[in-house]
A protein has these predicted regions:
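Conformationally flexible catalytic loops at phosphate/diphosphate-handling active centers
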Residues: 1-4
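Structural motif
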Residues: 7-9, 70, 187, 237-239
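Active-site diphosphate/adenylate-binding microenvironment
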Residues: 150-236
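Generic structural signal for well-ordered, non-membrane alpha-helical segments
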Residues: 14-25, 76-79, 119, 123, ...
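Phosphate- and divalent-cation-binding pockets in alpha/beta enzyme and binding domains
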Residues: 19-20, 81-82, 106, 125, ...
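Terminal amphipathic helices with adjacent charged low-complexity linkers/tails
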Residues: 95-147
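Active-site glycine-centered loops adjacent to acidic/histidine catalytic or metal-binding residues
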Residues: 243-244
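Glycine-rich, anion-gripping cofactor-binding loops and their flanking helix/strand elements
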Residues: 12-96, 104, 206-236, 248-250
Length: 250
């Protein structure tokens, strides 16, 4: 079914760093009918993945030709409200949810197949089965799907760069400056809700300790204490980006 669907979208939610998963998705995303939306907290990085989720979706508008026919999702809950809305509106013909939980959450109101297994094993097996498949056998309609998203990604980048160049001093500008100076060995913790959303507006380095956020049910609790606990067991730099209310709340 993966090879037959003209438009495939993979969505990665909250997930711990896993080089095997990133490597498998790197291979899978070589297929030109496949695009990967990887939120910052997914800790997934590939050459073509889209991590600046909200700004790319904003630049995409309401073009229905971008709707996926096959959606494959894994990881925890998404940060991006825009991505949730986009996928609920898209109504993909099939949605495979890779989730060890039972029953699996139907976040996008489109779940057709619950694959009750761990994401790491699934993606390694999936990439292995596709190893001998050649992209040229895909339907002509699907050839440009990934390319369409990459063009929008580039457009969104240029719009963002122009906006930030003219932006005055603000929390958004401060966030941009901070991201430029975070050491590579860092584990980055972002508090709810503004910091973790800002994180997905900027391209930034892949930090050795991963990117994390305590996504509590009531919003702002736990970010500071989570980062403090993490720093006790992590040998590198632990950095928390938070706001005054969130810091005081904890």
């Amino acid at each position: 079914r993966f090879l037959e669907a003209p438009r495939v979208m993979i969505v990665a939610g909250f997930y711990p760093p896993d080089e095997d998963v990133s490597a498998a998705l790197q291979d899978i995303c070589k297929f030109p009918h496949t695009v990967l939306f990887a939120e910052s907290l997914s800790n997934i990085r590939t050459d073509t993945s889209i991590g600046t989720v909200d700004r790319v979706l904003a630049a995409a508008g309401e073009d229905e030709s971008l709707y996926p026919e096959l959606l494959i999702s894994f990881g925890g809950s998404l940060v991006s409200r825009m991505l949730k809305t986009f996928l609920r509106r898209a109504k993909p013909a099939e949605h495979w949810g890779i989730d060890e939980r039972f029953p699996a959450p139907d976040t996008f109101c489109a779940l057709t197949h619950h694959i009750c297994t761990g994401a790491s094993g699934f993606w390694k097996e999936f990439a292995g089965r596709l190893k001998d498949k050649a992209p040229e056998f895909l339907s002509p309609e699907g050839v440009s799907y990934a390319g369409s998203w990459q063009r929008i990604k580039r457009k969104a980048y240029l719009l963002h760069r122009t906006f930030m160049a003219d932006a005055g001093w603000s929390d958004l500008k401060a966030f941009e400056v901070i991201l430029r100076h975070i050491p590579h060995d860092a584990a980055l913790h972002a508090a709810n809700s503004t910091p973790v959303r800002y994180l997905q507006l900027f391209e930034h380095a892949h930090y050795a300790g991963g990117e994390w956020s305590n996504r509590g049910t009531n919003g702002i609790e736990g970010a500071t204490s989570t980062a403090m606990g993490f720093s006790e067991v992590y040998s590198g730099t632990t950095l928390l980006i938070t706001g005054d209310l969130r810091f005081m709340y904890d």
